[in-house]
Design a protein with these regions (language model features):
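Catalytic phosphate-handling regions of large nucleic-acid enzymes and associated NTPases
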Residues: 1-222, 281
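Charged, surface-exposed alpha-helical interface/stalk elements
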Residues: 195-454
């Protein structure tokens, strides 16, 4: 193959920035829905193709997703993404967006996943509750290579970024964001949309099922995760939790080193690989116990780990945005989400108004037939249309009265008239209820329902 000359200046001016922008969008999660492109494609495929509770083989889903959403990087990569999304052990996802078969997606003791031909996944019930079907029409879908694919982002009622966290390394940027306590995030959102400009909340990282504590270290200016250790006597300790980010297998290797260099005498590994319960019994000397108290004990036994964060996210324009605090990310999310609540409200009112117009026209049409103002028996279609046109309050739909002319004969009765009357009343009440409800109250109501299942 002949060498091709390429203008270096042109490469750095056009090709490299284009690649970097695409790479960033792939590898860094959005602050709006907490998803990377591949994750969003998987969720969209499940929503459209397999919305039920029945699980589908991971391998099958990956292949269907690659074709359905025009994924450019192969089904094998999507299998790995599914594995990450389905992991639900402590330190992985707090609330996995995919519901996988137990044990197939790793544990705290061994986070390796089974082969994708053996594992199965489905949408988690939590994820379904994070989305509102009325938002789908508002967000719209992207158009790629002649096909409609997934939206640029979902608009969940809760920032999924802080439900499970996110990490990624791309061209020139990286992302490391830990999950937060959903109750605290909901409280922050409620305060913010109720008018509190800067809610004073610490919002420390939170890991579901983790027994240790997370504290902010002012000297290091970062959060730290602690394990749990109990002193039994002067020569014995029991460890019942490890810091976030330290795997059981790696910790055993570290304990072996402590034994080899004489720091500790011995240890017993009593961890339960079935339940992920952590339990190590440590044997030490009296001298060790005297010299190791407080933080020094935690540091020596690797029971404290820093949780540094890099607050880079993809924004609504698929560009990297660097934030300075968790609160700043939340504020940006709230601004976007409120925008879409306004759009949802407008969409609902418009949809209900259109439905009301149709029901009212049907009511007037049926009433006219019952009252014999309009006669349809032995009449040509054009004659019926002319009679309808004399009723100014009966509206056309898509430029014609076809929706009325197609009504079944049993709908042209006094009973149907009463039914339509009830439907109109119900729709008017729904319209009035939505109209008088503020978008802030709509969101608060959604969060109230979500909190019941978190």
């Amino acid at each position: 193959m002949a060498n091709k000359e390429y203008n270096v200046k042109e490469f750095f001016k056009t090709d490299l920035p284009a690649y970097a922008a695409y790479d960033n969008a792939r590898k860094i999660a959005s602050y709006i829905d907490g998803q990377k492109i591949s994750m969003r494609k998987i969720l969209y495929t499940l929503l459209k193709k397999y919305p039920g509770k029945e699980k589908i083989k991971t391998e099958t889903l990956a292949n269907v997703c690659a074709a359905f959403t025009n994924y450019l990087h192969g089904a094998a990569n999507l299998c790995g993404v599914c594995n990450t999304m389905a992991q639900n052990f402590v330190g992985a996802n707090n609330y996995a967006t995919l519901n996988g078969n137990t044990g197939g997606f790793g544990t705290r003791y061994d986070n390796n996943c089974a082969a994708p031909r053996y594992t199965k996944v489905a949408l988690s019930e939590i994820f379904k509750k994070l989305l509102n079907e009325n938002d789908e029409e508002i967000v719209g879908r992207q158009f790629f290579e002649g096909d409609y694919i997934e939206p640029k982002f979902f608009v969940p009622i809760f920032p999924i970024l802080f439900l499970n966290g996110a990490s990624g390394l791309s061209t020139g940027f990286s992302q490391d964001i830990y999950p937060r306590n959903p109750s605290e995030i909901i409280e922050y959102i409620k305060k913010k949309i109720s008018g509190v400009e800067k809610p004073r909340m610490q919002l420390l990282p939170w890991f579901r099922g983790h027994l240790g504590k997370v504290e902010f270290n002012k000297e290091l200016d970062r959060n730290e995760s602690f394990g749990v250790i109990t002193k039994n006597n002067m020569t014995s300790y029991t460890i019942t939790e490890l810091p976030i980010g330290i795997e059981c297998k790696k910790y055993i290797e570290y304990l072996d080193k402590l034994c080899d260099n004489g720091t500790i005498c011995d240890y017993n590994d009593k961890c339960d690989t079935e339940t992920d319960k952590i339990l190590f019994e440590i044997k030490t000397t009296r001298d060790f116990t005297k010299k190791h108290e407080g933080r020094k004990l935690f540091e020596t036994l690797h029971l404290v780990k820093s949780l540094p964060e890099t607050l880079c996210c993809i924004d609504e324009n698929n560009r990297v945005r660097e934030f300075t605090s968790i609160q700043e990310i939340l504020d940006a999310y709230i601004e976007i989400r409120l925008k879409y609540y306004n759009l949802r409200k407008d969409y609902l009112l418009k949809t209900i108004k259109k439905s009301l117009e149709e029901l009212s026209s049907k009511y007037l049409f049926v009433k006219a037939i019952v009252d014999k103002t309009i006669v349809v028996a032995n009449k040509k279609k054009d004659d019926i249309v002319k009679q309808i046109e004399k009723q100014p309050k009966i509206l056309k739909q898509d430029g014609s009265y076809e929706y009325l002319l197609r009504m079944q004969i049993y709908n042209l009765t006094a009973e149907k008239l009463e039914e339509l009357k009830c439907q109109i009343k119900s729709k008017k009440e729904e319209f009035d209820s939505i109209k008088k409800t503020s978008v802030e109250d709509m969101w608060t109501n959604d969060l109230h329902e979500l909190k019941k299942v978190l």
